[in-house]
Amino acid sequence: MFPLISFSPTSLDFTFFAIIISGFVFIITRWNSNSKKRLNLPPGPPGWPVVGNLFQFARSGKPFFEYAEDLKKTYGPIFTLRMGTRTMIILSDATLVHEALIQRGALFASRPAENPTRTIFSCNKFTVNAAKYGPVWRSLRRNMVQNMLSSTRLKEFGKLRQSAMDKLIERIKSEARDNDGLIWVLKNARFAAFCILLEMCFGIEMDEETIEKMDEILKTVLMTVDPRIDDYLPILAPFFSKERKRALEVRREQVDYVVGVIERRRRAIQNPGSDKTASSFSYLDTLFDLKIEGRKTTPSNEELVTLCSEFLNGGTDTTGTAIEWGIAQLIANPEIQSRLYDEIKSTVGDDRRVDEKDVDKMVFLQAFVKELLRKHPPTYFSLTHAVMETTTLAGYDIPAGVNVEVYLPGISEDPRIWNNPKKFDPDRFMLGKEDADITGISGVKMIPFGVGRRICPGLAMATIHVHLMLARMVQEFEWCAHPPGSEIDFAGKLEFTVVMKNPLRAMVKPRI
């Protein structure tokens, strides 16, 4: 998931942009005037010619999600923003989201046009997440779900997950020994998730240097595709030629490095036994000869790089940040941590490690993770939707091609849906109390993984990773604040996902 708008609002130079756009004001104003006569868009703040609401957002000095939250209070559950050349229709009501993405899911299942930088890295939208609703998307998603993310296939990777959990615990113990019990939570959690996904993706073991290099490259890619002002005002693109050149350099580095790993797997398949670390199956294996509807050719090397990068990015940071927020809540609520540990002990005793079969029996752990995903979804907005053809919603026109954004906290913290929504309370999900179908099929109450046809295909895998990782970490360690007695700062900031503004460092005390 990429951030919706993450450039600094204070970085906009108003005089510069005023000069740039002055020659276009008359033409664009007339065009907008004619458009408004044709369309009945949802309400929203009046904007300036050409730039729309960009200046208002910049002058607010707020992150985009806070700006959207303020507008929701003024304009209601569906409103319009014009951010330069992009029109955004933002939904923050559970009923409207259910109508759009579930009841009328096929119509709202496409994606809008990408900016030029992102197109470089997506191979012109050749990914499960970015592809327009159609044959390419169907082919890519069907392959990923059936061959990698089915319940049967996920079970086959059980030993890999257990091995990764053992290594995670050893890494935490080692770091704690070297730092008087103090560890970085996010760094360790995302490394464990990344290692699992690397082996699932490529089917070969890698040394730590290779793992860290791959991680570094993918992080650089994510920073490179971060939105810029010229994504919203393409007329400014000539002023960002250095950034485009840098993006092409990053892409070349990504392709060159990842293709080397791809070729290693290809050789292992062609020469069985030549790579002693090679596993019997990987995601990459399913892509080599993948048939795409409407195409005669199989994916190119560059497309393989794109699809593998999507697989890795999609599950690394979402899992890592969920664990960081989860440990933070356990530290802030020691009574919850005690209940979770007691449930683990009553389920597995003192003599063995928690495994995935145990996790399925832990009612309080299940409730804790649901509440974690409700209170701390991976991002503030779901991936952007677009309608296949102009339609209406709530009596307003929704034109084809506009960005349809779903503001997640508007639903997961709606007091009409949740009792005391600001409170972190796993008991709300215990038997006989509140519940939520995170797929959204029976009703939208929380959508940490999206809903409808474009729901995250890795939902089941992600929840397995989060449940198992939390259970092992709590079984092995008591988690305490650093410095002792200090309060946890739950302020967040948007990077690739919503992370803690002040990264969590925690004290650990081994239990067993």
UniProtKB/Swiss-Prot annotation:
It is found in: Membrane. It is an enzyme of class 1 (oxidoreductase). GO terms for biological process: fatty acid oxidation. Keywords: Heme, Iron, Membrane, Metal-binding, Monooxygenase, NADP, Oxidoreductase, Transmembrane, Transmembrane helix. Signal peptide: none annotated. The chain crosses the membrane at residues 9-29. Heme binds at residue 456. InterPro entries: Cyt_P450, Cyt_P450_CS, Cyt_P450_E_grp-I, Cyt_P450_sf. Its cofactor is heme. CDD domains: CYP77_89. GO terms for cellular component: membrane. One of its GO terms (molecular function) is monooxygenase activity. Its EC number is 1.14.-.-. It is a single-pass membrane protein. It comes from the Eukaryota. Its main location: membrane. Catalyzes the epoxidation of physiological unsaturated fatty acids in vitro. Can use laurate, oleate, linoleate, linolenate and vernolate as substrate. Belongs to the cytochrome P450 family. This is Cytochrome P450 77A4. It comes from Arabidopsis thaliana (Mouse-ear cress). The lineage of its organism: Eukaryota, Viridiplantae, Streptophyta, Embryophyta, Tracheophyta.
